[in-house]
Protein backbone atom coordinates (compact mmCIF):
# COMPACT_ATOMS: atom_id res chain seq x y z
CA UNK A 1 0.00 0.00 0.00
CA UNK A 2 1.30 3.42 -0.86
CA UNK A 3 2.15 5.91 1.84
CA UNK A 4 -0.30 8.51 0.53
CA UNK A 5 -3.18 6.01 0.66
CA UNK A 6 -2.32 5.04 4.22
CA UNK A 7 -2.11 8.66 5.34
CA UNK A 8 -5.44 9.49 3.65
CA UNK A 9 -7.20 6.57 5.33
CA UNK A 10 -5.63 7.43 8.71
CA UNK A 11 -6.68 11.09 8.55
CA UNK A 12 -10.19 10.13 7.41
CA UNK A 13 -10.62 7.70 10.30
CA UNK A 14 -9.26 10.26 12.74
CA UNK A 15 -11.70 12.91 11.48
CA UNK A 16 -14.68 10.54 11.73
CA UNK A 17 -13.63 9.52 15.25
CA UNK A 18 -13.30 13.11 16.48
CA UNK A 19 -16.65 14.04 14.92
CA UNK A 20 -18.35 11.03 16.52
CA UNK A 21 -16.89 11.85 19.92
CA UNK A 22 -17.98 15.48 19.63
CA UNK A 23 -21.54 14.44 18.76
CA UNK A 24 -21.60 11.96 21.65
CA UNK A 25 -20.37 14.63 24.06
CA UNK A 26 -22.89 17.19 22.78
CA UNK A 27 -26.00 15.00 22.62
CA UNK A 28 -25.23 11.80 24.57
CA UNK A 29 -25.09 11.07 28.29
CA UNK A 30 -22.20 13.51 29.02
CA UNK A 31 -24.36 16.40 27.76
CA UNK A 32 -26.21 16.46 31.09
CA UNK A 33 -22.99 17.64 32.77
CA UNK A 34 -22.50 20.57 30.40
CA UNK A 35 -23.46 23.98 31.73
CA UNK A 36 -25.67 26.39 29.83
CA UNK A 37 -24.34 29.94 30.09
CA UNK A 38 -27.63 31.39 28.84
CA UNK A 39 -29.55 29.79 31.72
CA UNK A 40 -27.00 31.04 34.26
CA UNK A 41 -27.27 34.65 33.08
CA UNK A 42 -30.91 35.66 33.08
CA UNK A 43 -31.89 39.31 33.10
From Swiss-Prot:
Question: Which InterPro entries has this protein been placed in?
Answer: PSII_PsbN
The keyword Repeat is annotated on this UniProt entry: no
Q: How does it sit in the membrane?
A: Single-pass membrane protein
Q: Where are the transmembrane segments?
A: 5-27
- Main localisation, per the record? plastid
Q: Where in the cell is it found?
A: Plastid, Chloroplast thylakoid membrane
Q: What does this protein do?
A: May play a role in photosystem I and II biogenesis.
Write the protein's name.
Answer: Protein PsbN
Amino acid sequence: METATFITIFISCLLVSVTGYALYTAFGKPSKQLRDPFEEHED
